[in-house]
Amino acid sequence: MKGGWGALERAIIKTIPVLSSYQTGGCQAVYEISVGYSRTRIQFGTPIGRFQRVQDHIINLVNQLDAARWTSNEAIWKLDSGREPFDSVHLAKVVSSEAYLQACDHAHEVHAGVASMTEYGLTLHTTASRTLYTYLGDPRFHRHKLAAALGL
């Protein structure tokens, strides 16, 4: 169909910020689960959230969450305000995909063995993060699109 790809590409450009926001919400949920667990899990007579290594993982979760939130919000803002969104859209997909994946990895470090149980909610986020990582293009694809949009 003549001109069909252009219409599809415009639709995908409008869909990616929604997907990025969904992944950001997943990061937020993983963060909340991990912080709650680190406050209630007692080891050696103290909550595990007091241990420096656990705090390091929580800080990494916050960093991933903030990066995903800022880039997703910028992409949505540019689309909503009628500005040229291509660079922000591709950047949001790269950052949010990697953030959700890495946030789940850090959450598994905080939770240790309990995180691998299917009854525990973290496994749902881990599966979703791996699935959505490549949905509508993996980060490598979007890095190439971002470079092309920036003229690099």
Task: Describe each region flagged by the PLM.
Residues M1-G6:
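Long, acidic (Asp/Glu-rich), low-complexity accessory segments flanking structured domains
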Residues R10-L152:
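Alpha-helical interface subdomain recognition
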